[in-house]
Amino acid sequence: MRNINEALHEHLAEVLKIYPEDQILGVFAYGSMNYGTYIKGISDVDTKAIIIPTFRELCLNDKPVSREIHFENGEHCEIKDIREIVKMFKKQSINFLEILFTEYCWLNPMYKVLWKIYFCQFKEDIVRFDENKAWQSVIGQAIHTLKQNPTNGKQISNGYRLLYFLEQYKEGKPYLECIKPTEENLATLLQFKKCSCLSANYAKDLIERFEEMKEFRFPKKDNSKLNNWLNNGIEYSIRHLDNIRKEPWRWKYDGESDLSETK
């Protein structure tokens, strides 16, 4: 059976072949293990790695890193510059926002405080940076997923999971409660997920419900302070990398880096 922590270390090892450790903020799992729908021996472990750009790359106006590593077992690691990560946070992409809450990650000790201060400390605010954008983003993702393969059990399961998410998000529930279904709902999702072929009526009904939800709007709010804070997080992370390279002895970490939880 696939061990999630072992997979994280394997993904990190591949990222380290491309970037030095001081440029890697962390490697974070995303997907079924964060929703409670991970099935041992069946589900893949996919990750996102956050890279800090150097001052030289900024001066040369290098394009922010955005690439993927594909593994033979079907898993993949998405590598992104922290500027791109923050951009996806602001776009309210659920696949990126969930890394703020995952229990499965390798967090570079050199960036642990920075990650906590600029991102994790305000994660509930970040996930509601633009609630209307988040709402429409999830609806669009759900409809696209269901239309791709309307009889596939995994897609139907994802559809119901996203419907549950929207219902909880609308009620203002904590984000972790939004992305992790109750035990009762989880049992239903897993049942659907294990089915290879289902009636297309499930997808049809779900799409109709999502289409109806498109009209809903949250009250607008001022997010300028949070926007500035996130931008400061980008700036400070780049300055921090520069400080690490100027005085590496101050940031030396003895021993193997542990898998950490972002809480």
Region spans (language model):
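Helical scaffold of the NTase/Pol beta-like nucleotidyltransferase catalytic core
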Residues: 1-29
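N-terminal regions immediately upstream of nucleotidyltransferase
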Residues: 1-10, 190, 214-221, 254
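A generic fold-level signal
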Residues: 22, 40-42, 154
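Short conserved micro-motifs at the rims of enzyme active sites and ligand-binding pockets
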Residues: 60, 171-172
